[in-house]
Amino acid sequence: AKVIRSGKVSPADPQAQEIHGSPPARVDGIVTTGDVVRVGPLRLTAFATPGHTEGSTSWYWKSCEGTDCRTITYVDSITALPLGTYRFADHPDRVAMFRKTIAEVAALECGILLTPHPAASAMFERMSGARPLEEPGSCKALADSAARRLDAALGKGADK
């Protein structure tokens, strides 16, 4: 909420050297893991997924068409993206935060998985019908990919 209120990127953000902030915005409330936000008939449950940013928040909810109900899970970006001179190897607390988030996402039964970067979860292929909309193990696959990217980011930092 601090970044949204101020519009200033946290210097601890791995992308801080490349992101130049945004206009400040009013924050009406803060959600934490387990909080439920109602949007019309939907009840969205928040869960923290820090890593890509410290305040990353993901959501899950049940959506029904008649008696056909599905769980939908939006997982915010869990990609380790160091920009500029940022080295994950120099920030063990951030690495631990990422690893905890990745493990939590891997354990989820996502139902229909949504991500902010469609390629991370084959969203376009699933929405077009080229792949099943709901794929068992989709959260584990997303987490495994994120773990590989984090390991690669750590490897890049180790040789400098």
Segments the model singles out, each with a brief description of its role:
Residues 48-50, 74-76, 112-118:
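Active-site neighborhood of phospho(di)ester-bond hydrolases with catalytic His/Asp-centered motifs
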Residues 6-9, 62, 126:
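Residue-level signal for well-ordered alpha-helical positions
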Residues 57-58, 123:
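Generic hydrophobic alpha-helical membrane-span motif
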Residues 2-3, 30, 36, 77, ...:
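Residue-level preference for alpha-helix termini and adjacent loops
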Residues 54-55, 120:
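Short active-site segment of divalent metal-dependent hydrolases/proteases
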Residues 58-81:
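Conserved beta-strand hairpin/beta-sheet module of binuclear metal-dependent hydrolase folds
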Residues 1-48, 53-54, 82, 87-111:
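Metallo-beta-lactamase
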Residues 66-68, 80-160:
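Accessory terminal helices/loops
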